[in-house]
Amino acid sequence: MARSHDTKGSGGLSQRQLRVGEQVRHTLAQVLQRGEIRDDLIERTVISVSEVRMSPDLKIATCFITPLGSADPQAVIKALASHAKFIRGRVAPSLAQMKYMPEFRFRPDTSFDNFSKIDALLRSPEVARDLSHDDDEDGGADEAPRNGDE
């Protein structure tokens, strides 16, 4: 599931960056799901890998993660970062076609928080009032005259 994190430059991401990022995301999610990383915090936390963003040279993989439950995101990120070389070795077989294995960087995925803030704003009474007011104004003007009503 792609997230809308800020990108540098106006070109966006290339097809290769997107393809490799998705391949890394899928493999990383499998490594986490199988419990291959021997760390108490990582083993007892369900971690969702929502996106992996590759650098233009494909040497850096920025992984956006969300720990599900009550786990502290920063503690989980710190634990994952301490096992980055092990993770790199586990992901390497799925990226055998690449010249270099990417360096892993872990970041919290804040897109869900942003979506919930936007949802709360859209559900606020002020917005509902404005939307109903706009509907009332537009409702009469948009109707086409019927035969005999002119």
Swiss-Prot record:
One of its GO terms (biological process) is maturation of SSU-rRNA. GO terms for cellular component: cytosol. Keywords: Cytoplasm, Ribosome biogenesis. GO terms for molecular function: ribosomal small subunit binding. Its main location: cytoplasm. Pfam families: RBFA (PF02033). Residues 126-150 are annotated as: Disordered. Coiled coil: none annotated. It comes from the Bacteria. Monomer. Binds 30S ribosomal subunits, but not 50S ribosomal subunits or 70S ribosomes. HAMAP family: RbfA. Belongs to the RbfA family. One of several proteins that assist in the late maturation steps of the functional core of the 30S ribosomal subunit. Associates with free 30S ribosomal subunits (but not with 30S subunits that are part of 70S ribosomes or polysomes). Required for efficient processing of 16S rRNA. May interact with the 5'-terminal helix region of 16S rRNA. This is Ribosome-binding factor A.
